[in-house]
């Protein structure tokens, strides 16, 4: 086998059909679109328009609500914090603050604060200070002999 002998399998590369290129091509003049009307033009139909029938998006009831002052927390699991402590990326002798979690690379952005959840095992004594935590996370840290303190989020001051 040589490079110049290589070719696609039969039917693998389908030739493009050039439409509207004269009567001799077989797909000239109307180009397979039929005669006149909106569907024969480019752009075809208006999205969501159902020909005068009440459109689906109007037939269904409105639902839901977006809370304007919703808090978005960066979520961290206890198992990950323990993993970073074991790897030496977080110093467990001092209090583990939100700034320490960001500096270690465990959390990229703080958002409205950091919330700790109980997934994973805690083997050592950890003293954690964060904006939010689940009840089970607080219990798990206390069971391991540490403390999980939930602090009030710091309000961002805007300079006008």
Curated annotation (Swiss-Prot):
Residues of the region (Disordered) are 1-42
Q: Which residue ranges have biased composition labelled Basic and acidic residues? A: 1-13
Q: Name one Pfam family in it.
A: Ribosomal_L27A
- Residue ranges, compositional bias (Gly residues): 21-35
InterPro entries for this protein: Ribosomal_uL15 (IPR030878), Ribosomal_uL15/eL18 (IPR021131), Ribosomal_uL15/eL18_sf (IPR036227), Ribosomal_uL15_bac-type (IPR005749), Ribosomal_uL15_CS (IPR001196)
**MF GO annotations:** rRNA binding; structural constituent of ribosome
Q: Which residues form the signal peptide?
A: none
Keywords per UniProt:
Ribonucleoprotein, Ribosomal protein, RNA-binding, rRNA-binding
Q: Which GO terms describe its biological process?
A: translation
One GO cellular component term noted in the UniProt record for this chain = cytosolic large ribosomal subunit
Q: Note the subunit structure.
A: Part of the 50S ribosomal subunit.
Cross-referenced PANTHER family: 50S RIBOSOMAL PROTEIN L15 (PTHR12934), LARGE RIBOSOMAL SUBUNIT PROTEIN UL15M (PTHR12934:SF11)
The entry's function note states: Binds to the 23S rRNA.
Record family assignment: Belongs to the universal ribosomal protein uL15 family.
**Which HAMAP family does UniProt cross-reference here?**
Ribosomal_uL15 (MF_01341)
What name does UniProt use for this protein?
Answer: Large ribosomal subunit protein uL15
What is the organism field in this record?
Roseobacter denitrificans (strain ATCC 33942 / OCh 114) (Erythrobacter sp. (strain OCh 114))
